[in-house]
């Protein structure tokens, strides 16, 4: 009887350990998986136009032109849209806005509202674009339009930002940088107009999130 009791106790301890350690093991595995994903970065180059890209990549003129034109189309689809030129200029500065092409990602009802108020809606000019390899290791290139403001009061002043408001540093073409692969993923189409200053608020929020993530990572690394 004593032996049986001993065996049962051992079995209980084994089962208890399995039940309580399994979540910990899963958590550790998840951390390693996340860390692996975070390291899946990509090196991209920032250009103002196809000529800049061609000059930096001799023999790749056709690819540069294709990437630039695709970035322009993506900008039309995903750039912040404004009901009036004044709202766009207040965010991006004089000479930095253009009328958005019809059907450029806007929902029909919002398009009608903007057209009723000003004849069309407005969007910032594409200030540059990121160019990198296609996700999945394809032979082609991926691209992402970038925007910048010339209004000193805007959070986007002198910086490159994507359509979501994520900041990629100084608006200086010719740079090479490392970004998460998600940075090159297609962005959602813009389906509503942005209020004056709304895109700047998005940039400020993104910057706060980036600083918070960096701080958390630093604290974790430091123990």
Swiss-Prot record:
Which segments show compositional bias classed as Low complexity? 178-195
Q: Where do the record's region annotations for Disordered lie?
A: 178-223
Q: Where is the composition biased (Polar residues)?
A: 204-223
- InterPro entries, from UniProt? Biofilm_formation_YgiB
Q: Please name one Pfam family that this protein belongs to.
A: DUF1190
HAMAP family, per this entry?
A: UPF0441
The family note in this entry says:
Belongs to the UPF0441 family.
Q: What is this protein called?
A: UPF0441 protein YgiB
What organism does this protein naturally occur in? Shigella boydii serotype 4 (strain Sb227)
């Amino acid at each position: 009887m004593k032996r049986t009791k001993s065996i049962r106790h051992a079995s209980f301890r084994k089962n208890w350990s399995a039940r309580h350690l399994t979540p910990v093991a899963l958590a550790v595995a998840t951390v390693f998986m996340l860390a692996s994903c975070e390291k899946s970065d990509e090196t991209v180059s920032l250009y103002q136009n196809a000529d800049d890209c061609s000059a930096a990549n001799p023999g790749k003129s056709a690819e540069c032109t294709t990437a630039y034109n695709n970035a322009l189309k993506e900008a039309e689809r995903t750039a912040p849209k404004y009901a009036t030129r004044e709202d766009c200029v207040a965010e991006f500065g004089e000479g930095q806005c253009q009328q958005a092409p019809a059907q450029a990602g806007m929902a029909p009802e919002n398009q009608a509202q903007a057209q009723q108020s000003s004849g069309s809606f407005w969007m910032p000019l594409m200030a540059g674009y990121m160019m990198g390899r296609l996700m999945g290791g394809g032979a082609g290139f991926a691209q992402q339009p970038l925007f910048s403001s010339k209004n000193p009061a805007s959070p986007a002043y002198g910086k490159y930002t994507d359509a979501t408001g994520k900041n990629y540093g100084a608006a200086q073409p010719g740079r090479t940088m490392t970004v998460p692969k998600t940075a090159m993923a297609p962005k959602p189409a813009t389906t509503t107009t942005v209020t004056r200053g709304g895109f700047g608020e998005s940039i400020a929020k993104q910057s706060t999130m980036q600083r918070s993530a960096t701080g958390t990572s630093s604290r974790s690394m430091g123990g």
